[in-house]
């Protein structure tokens, strides 16, 4: 359905700092699409992916598309949900795509009830319905495993056409020492990821 619609798109080439060039042009875009960086070296020497750098600097949603993937139907969508500001932003940035989806699954490691007794993930499903996301929607709880491992495993078991998630940023030395969920997902997933910061 999306491929049949007319969309106003633009392509640009830039010299110099790639991330700065994308950031400067992204201010006037609804969505930025970048390719996943194919790193040939060892995992220990992998630089931050361009997609992550663009996400934390441009203020726009970024669709990171793996090199081996052709965009097709976005019928089955997973939403990585932790209730954070970044996750909320990602969901709202993705609403036009979520409305077109046939199936939306909220993937979370949040408990079934918050301090005020609400189920945060179920509340998100209700919110999505109010915004026209009338789909086969449900919640999958990941349990206590590290977030990026559990999320990656669930997405790989699929079948999903798109992952929507918040993009997190920490000081560079923390990312080097501890790694990061956003970087881990962007480096390893084989489906497009829509990320907002």
Regions inferred by a protein language model and the residue ranges of each:
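A short helix-to-beta-strand connector/capping loop
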Residues: 3-10, 131-136
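A structural signal for isolated positions on well-ordered beta-strands in alpha/beta enzyme cores
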Residues: 10-12, 78, 103-107, 136, ...
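Charged docking surfaces used in two-component/phosphorelay signaling
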Residues: 11-20, 140-147
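Gly/Ser-rich helix-loop-strand patches that form or flank binding pockets
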Residues: 19-70, 154-197
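Well-ordered alpha-helical segments embedded in enzymatic catalytic cores
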Residues: 21, 89-93, 150
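Short acidic/Ser/Thr-enriched loop-to-helix initiation segments
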Residues: 44-60, 66-131
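Glycine/small-residue-rich hydrophobic helix-like segments
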Residues: 103-169
């Amino acid at each position: 359905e999306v491929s049949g619609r007319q969309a106003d798109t633009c392509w640009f080439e830039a010299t110099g700092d790639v991330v700065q060039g994308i950031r400067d042009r992204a201010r006037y875009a609804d969505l930025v699409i970048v390719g996943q960086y194919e790193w040939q070296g060892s995992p220990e020497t992998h630089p931050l992916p361009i997609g992550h750098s663009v996400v934390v600097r441009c203020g726009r949603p970024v669709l990171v598309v793996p090199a081996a993937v052709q965009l097709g139907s976005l019928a089955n969508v997973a939403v990585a949900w932790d209730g954070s500001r970044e996750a909320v932003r990602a969901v709202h940035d993705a609403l036009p795509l979520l409305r077109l989806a046939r199936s939306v699954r909220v993937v979370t490691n949040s408990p079934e009830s918050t301090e005020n007794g609400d189920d945060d993930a179920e509340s998100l499903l209700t919110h999505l319905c109010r915004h026209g996301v009338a789909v086969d929607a449900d919640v999958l709880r990941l349990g206590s495993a590290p977030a990026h491992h559990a999320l990656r495993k669930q997405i790989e078991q699929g079948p999903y056409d798109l992952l929507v998630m918040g993009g997190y940023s920490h000081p560079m030395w923390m990312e080097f020492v501890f790694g990061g969920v956003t970087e881990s997902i962007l480096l390893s997933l084989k489906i497009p990821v829509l990320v907002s910061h």
